[in-house]
């Protein structure tokens, strides 16, 4: 058994070696004993099958297992020479070249090594965050919104017409081209006028109706309406108004606060809670609209390290397969039947693959640095929640993700969000502390 090793960089190494066939044959007896322990052949007791029978029936497996053991010995010796611990390898070593000659096998093995990242100054890379002060008016507006949402609906007893901000209890049936359509009918439906719950123009057309009045209104479905067969079409609705309802707003005081946040609460503590919620909403908006993508690019620029080529190649394969799945059949066949074109198209994903692998290593290292983790239950909850929000069956969605090995990707996305939120939260707190300090000095 002979080999040479080459450390290409901190994340990649190559082993070139040869193993004599006689060395592999020395493994036969050991391999045969392993096989004998586990096989069962009619006419023989388990573990008592004659060696010659095993050699005849399992010749191919014996050759493969013995060869694998010899390669493993070569790999172990080469790792020792390279001073690489087996647990620092990432992915499986790849046999990139393999030639079987009359007296030996020659092979090349490529190794991917988990890179080491320097995260000493990572918090300095987080962009500055400027938070708007949560004003008293904003808090009061949210309080009024909460009160409005919790207010009971009471029927208007005096005779008057339907107005904006009222709630109309109606029967309705819609028609397109003179025919009723699915989902276009409702009875005793409570519709808040001004909520824009129905298609544009519908709610405004009800204003001025009286109890018991019937009215036919004409509207046009938006061009981008979710039901494609209705998009852009004119429709008429027969509407009957049964009741005019109005919300009775509660008094916003300590009792109201208790009904919202519990007996230990008062109006001031509720306002404090609302302020925290508004700050969280502001941070989330800034994170999603401005900082997430910006912070990722900053981390990619400032935390540089060698990438394991094997992992980059795997990511290129994933991106290439995803791109192929989006092609029209004729475009797919064109690439499928042209190896040169396939290689060319696959290569276009290299930069994206490198960036994806780099940010994955960065996020994993940051998660370890800050003791951030995502457990399996959180992943399941996320999958179930998103499925329900999309109107899909959660169990079927989970099975789809598991079958297509998509769960790890979801977990990685969740981890990335949590790590970035952690870094930005630290910056938010710094910004908040600086703002408070400036106020104290004024």
Swiss-Prot record:
Annotated compartments: Cytoplasm
Cross-referenced PROSITE patterns: FKBP_PPIASE (PS50059)
Primary localization class, coarse: cytoplasm
Pfam families the UniProt entry points to: FKBP_C (PF00254), Trigger_C (PF05698), Trigger_N (PF05697)
UniProt keyword terms in alphabetical order: Cell cycle, Cell division, Chaperone, Cytoplasm, Isomerase, Rotamase
InterPro entries reported for this sequence: PPIase_dom_sf, PPIase_FKBP_dom, Trig_fac, Trigger_fac_C, Trigger_fac_C_sf, Trigger_fac_ribosome-bd_bac, Trigger_fac_ribosome-bd_sf, Trigger_fact/SurA_dom_sf
Transmembrane domains' residue ranges: none
Domain PPIase FKBP-type: 165-250
GO biological processes: cell division; protein folding; protein transport
MF annotations from Gene Ontology: peptidyl-prolyl cis-trans isomerase activity
Main enzyme class: isomerase
Reaction(s) catalysed (UniProt annotation): [protein]-peptidylproline (omega=180) = [protein]-peptidylproline (omega=0)
EC number: 5.2.1.8
Gene Ontology cellular component annotations, sorted alphabetically: cytoplasm
The family this protein is said to belong to: Belongs to the FKBP-type PPIase family. Tig subfamily.
Domains as described in the record: Consists of 3 domains; the N-terminus binds the ribosome, the middle domain has PPIase activity, while the C-terminus has intrinsic chaperone activity on its own.
Role, per record: Involved in protein export. Acts as a chaperone by maintaining the newly synthesized protein in an open conformation. Functions as a peptidyl-prolyl cis-trans isomerase.
Protein name (database record): Trigger factor
Organism of provenance: Helicobacter hepaticus (strain ATCC 51449 / 3B1)
Top-level taxonomy: Bacteria, Pseudomonadati, Campylobacterota, Epsilonproteobacteria, Campylobacterales
Gene assigned in the entry: tig
């Amino acid at each position: 058994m002979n080999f040479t090793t080459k450390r290409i960089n901190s994340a990649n190494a190559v082993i070139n070696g040869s193993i004599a066939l006689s060395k592999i044959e020395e493994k036969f007896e050991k391999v045969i004993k392993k096989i004998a322990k586990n096989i069962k052949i009619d006419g023989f007791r388990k573990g008592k099958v004659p060696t010659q029978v095993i050699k005849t029936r399992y010749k191919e497996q014996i050759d493969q297992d013995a060869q694998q053991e010899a390669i493993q010995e070569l790999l172990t010796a080469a790792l020792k020479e390279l001073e690489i611990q087996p647990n620092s390898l990432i992915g499986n070593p790849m046999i990139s070249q393999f030639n079987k000659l009359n007296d030996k096998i020659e092979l090349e093995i490529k190794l991917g090594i988990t890179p080491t990242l320097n995260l000493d100054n990572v918090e300095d890379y987080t962009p500055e965050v400027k938070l708007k002060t949560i004003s008293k008016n904003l808090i009061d507006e949210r309080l009024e919104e909460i009160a409005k949402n919790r207010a009971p609906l009471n029927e208007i007893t005096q005779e008057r017409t339907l107005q904006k901000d009222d709630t109309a209890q109606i029967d309705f049936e819609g028609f397109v081209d003179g025919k009723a359509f699915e989902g276009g009918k409702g009875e005793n439906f409570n519709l808040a006028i001004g909520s824009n719950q129905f298609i544009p123009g519908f709610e405004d057309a009800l204003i001025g109706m009286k109890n018991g009045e019937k009215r036919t209104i004409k509207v046009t479905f938006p061009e981008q309406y979710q039901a494609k067969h209705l998009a852009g079409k004119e429709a008429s609705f027969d509407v009957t108004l049964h009741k005019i309802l109005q919300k009775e707003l509660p008094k916003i005081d300590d009792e109201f606060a208790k009904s919202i946040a519990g007996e230990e609460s008062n109006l001031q503590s509720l306002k404090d809670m609302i302020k925290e919620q508004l700050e969280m909403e502001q941070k989330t908006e800034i994170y999603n609209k401005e900082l997430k993508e910006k912070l990722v690019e900053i981390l990619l620029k400032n935390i540089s390290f060698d990438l394991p080529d094997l992992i980059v190649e795997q990511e290129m394969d994933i991106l290439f397969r995803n791109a192929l799945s989006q092609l029209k059949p004729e475009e797919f066949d064109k690439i499928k039947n042209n190896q040169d074109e396939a290689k060319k198209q696959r290569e276009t994903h290299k930069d994206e693959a490198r960036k994806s692998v780099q940010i994955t290593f960065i996020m994993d290292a940051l998660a370890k640095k800050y003791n951030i983790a995502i457990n399996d239950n959180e992943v399941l909850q996320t999958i179930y929640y998103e499925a329900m929000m999309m109107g899909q069956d959660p169990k079927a969605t989970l099975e789809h993700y598991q079958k297509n090995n998509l769960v790890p990707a979801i977990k990685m996305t969740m981890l990335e969000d949590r790590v970035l939120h952690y870094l930005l939260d630290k910056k938010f707190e710094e910004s908040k502390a600086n703002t408070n300090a400036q106020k104290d000095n004024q």
